[in-house]
């Protein structure tokens, strides 16, 4: 009887989903927001998080759409390594820049070495999304490079 109760409780635990994105103008924010909403609709406990902006403030402010997006999403918390440890599943969303993830996303991923070394990335269920302003902009290469990192983590990659 106790085992039945425990297994029933386990079945009702919400999946902890971190949706981590970088977006200059808002496209990947919209993708991430939709993924977070879908997770919530399915009963997941969701954290919608952005990675730290590393472009100089003067550059961000010199591009009206970039500045407007930064201001509109100022309320979104920045992702930390602790969010990766917390999550059961992670969806990354980043623009494609010349066939690779943005430097902002890579900078965040590069901070995760200490939690990887402790085994905190093993068996995380992960996926990724990307966008580019042009056809054949390197989206596939971006996703594959992100997945290479995640394979190295020991994560379980779920492709679209």
What annotation goes with each model-predicted range?
Residues 3-4, 8-117:
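N-terminal beta1-alpha1-beta2 submodule of the flavodoxin-like/Rossmannoid cofactor-binding fold
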Residues 122-160:
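Short, glycine-/small-residue-rich phosphate/pyrophosphate-handling segment
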């Amino acid at each position: 009887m106790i085992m039945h109760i425990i297994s029933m409780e386990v079945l009702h635990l919400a999946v902890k989903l971190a949706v981590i994105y970088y977006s200059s103008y808002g496209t990947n924010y919209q993708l991430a927001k939709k993924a977070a909403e879908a997770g919530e609709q399915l009963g997941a406990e969701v954290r919608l998080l952005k990675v730290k902006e590393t472009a100089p403030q003067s550059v961000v402010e010199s591009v009206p759409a970039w500045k407007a997006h930064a201001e509109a999403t100022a309320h979104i918390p920045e992702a930390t390594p602790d969010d990766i440890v917390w999550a059961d599943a992670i969806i990354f969303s980043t623009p494609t820049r010349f066939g690779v993830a943005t430097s902002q996303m890579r900078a965040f991923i590069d901070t995760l070495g200490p939690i990887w070394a402790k085994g905190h990335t093993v068996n995380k269920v992960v996926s990724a999304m990307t966008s580019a302003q042009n056809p054949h902009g390197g989206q596939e290469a971006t996703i594959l490079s992100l997945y290479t990192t995640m394979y190295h983590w020991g994560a379980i990659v779920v492709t679209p």
